[in-house]
A protein has these predicted regions:
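Flexible, charged surface loops at secondary-structure boundaries
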Residues: 17-19, 59-61, 94-100, 114-118, ...
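Conserved AMP-binding/adenylate-forming core of the ANL superfamily
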Residues: 25-60, 168-192
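Conserved AMP-binding/adenylation subdomain of ANL enzymes
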Residues: 183-198, 205-252
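Long terminal accessory regions outside catalytic cores
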Residues: 1-8, 29-33, 41-42, 72-75
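ANL superfamily adenylate-forming
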Residues: 101-190, 244-247, 251-258
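Conserved AMP-binding/adenylate-forming
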Residues: 53-93, 195-216
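A short N-terminal helical cap/helix-turn-helix that marks the beginning
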Residues: 2-26, 157-158
Length: 258
C-alpha cells in the first residue's frame, strides 16, 4: 500500500501493481449458496468496466451524486470503486429523486424508489455469476447486459479530487481522502496488520462500519475480506468450517470484532 494513496481508487491501483493475484473479495450468500472469489486483478477489471460504463454510457462526471440501493455484495463493492475512479459521490441508500444516477438491486421496494431518479437508472439482478435479469425492469438498463462490452482499462476524463465528497452513509459525508484515512485507522483496529490477513465481515453495507470492514479497511491494509450476506442462515458449525477453509484471521459481526 502506497502512503501517497488518497482515494479508494488509488488504493486499488497500488494493490494491482504490488499483488494482483491475491484474493481481495470472497463473497458468500448463505440464502443461495453462492460463493465468488475475486482476485485484485479480477476485481479491478470489473471496477474498470463499471467506471467506463458510468463515465461513458451514463455520462457521469466528477461531483455527480449516485444513489446506491444495493446490499452488501461483491458487485456493490465494485460500484464503490468505480465511483471512486470517476469521482462520483456515492450515497448509500440515498434519495433517488436528488441523485444524478441511481443503481438499484432487484428488490421491488428499491426499484420502486429508484424510479424517482430523473437521471440514468441502472438495475442489478444480483444473480450468481453476475447473471442478468430474465427481463430488465421497466425503465432500467440491466447492468449485466451493459457492462461486459466495456473497456478493461479506465482513464478518467478529469482528475479526481481527493478532497471532494466521495461517500455519504448513515448521515455522514466523507471525502475520498477521509475514506482512505478512516480505512487505514480501522484496519489496525480490525487486526489487519499481518501479511495475508483475512477478515470475515457479516456487517451490512448501510453504515461506515459495514463498508469499512467489508471493503475499505482490507483494501487499505493490503489484505482481503470474506464478505458474508444472510449469514444468519449459516449454522455455528458451518461458520467454524468457513473460518477454517478460508483461513480467516479475524471476524467483524455486528458491533463485535474478534
Amino acid at each position: 500500500v502506497n502512503a501517497s494513496d488518497r482515494t479508494p481508487a488509488d488504493l486499488l491501483r497500488s494493490a494491482l501493481t504490488t499483488d494482483p493475484a491475491r484474493p481481495l473479495v470472497t463473497f458468500y450468500d448463505d440464502a443461495t449458496g453462492e460463493r465468488v472469489e475475486l482476485s485484485v486483478a479480477t476485481f479491478a477489471n470489473w471496477a474498470s468496466k463499471t467506471a467506463n460504463l458510468l463515465q461513458g454510457d451514463l455520462a457521469a462526471a466528477p461531483g455527480d451524486r449516485l444513489a446506491l440501493l444495493l446490499p452488501a455484495h461483491w458487485q456493490t463493492a465494485v460500484w464503490l470503486l468505480a465511483c471512486s475512479s470517476v469521482g462520483v459521490c456515492v450515497e448509500i441508500g440515498g434519495d433517488p429523486a436528488d441523485a444524478d444516477v441511481v443503481v438499484s438491486g432487484p428488490a421491488p421496494d428499491d426499484l420502486a424508489a429508484a424510479r424517482a431518479c430523473r437521471g440514468e437508472r441502472l438495475a442489478l439482478a444480483l444473480r450468481p455469476l453476475g447473471g442478468r435479469f430474465p427481463q430488465a425492469p421497466d425503465g432500467f438498463a440491466d447492468y449485466a447486459v451493459e457492462v461486459p462490452g466495456q473497456g478493461d482499462r479506465f482513464a478518467p476524463f478529469a482528475p479526481v479530487d481527493p478532497d471532494a465528497p466521495a461517500l455519504a452513509v448513515a448521515g455522514t459525508e466523507l471525502t475520498a481522502a477521509q475514506v482512505v484515512e478512516r480505512a487505514r485507522a480501522d484496519a489496525k483496529a480490525l487486526g489487519l496488520t499481518a501479511p495475508g490477513a483475512r477478515l470475515l465481515s457479516a456487517r451490512p453495507y448501510d453504515s461506515w462500519e459495514g463498508l469499512s470492514a467489508g471493503l475499505f479497511a482490507p483494501l487499505a491494509a493490503g489484505s482481503s475480506v470474506v464478505l458474508c450476506r444472510n449469514m444468519d442462515q449459516l449454522s455455528a458449525q458451518g461458520l467454524a468450517k468457513r473460518i477454517e477453509s478460508e483461513r480467516v484471521t479475524g471476524t467483524a459481526q455486528g458491533d463485535t470484532v474478534s
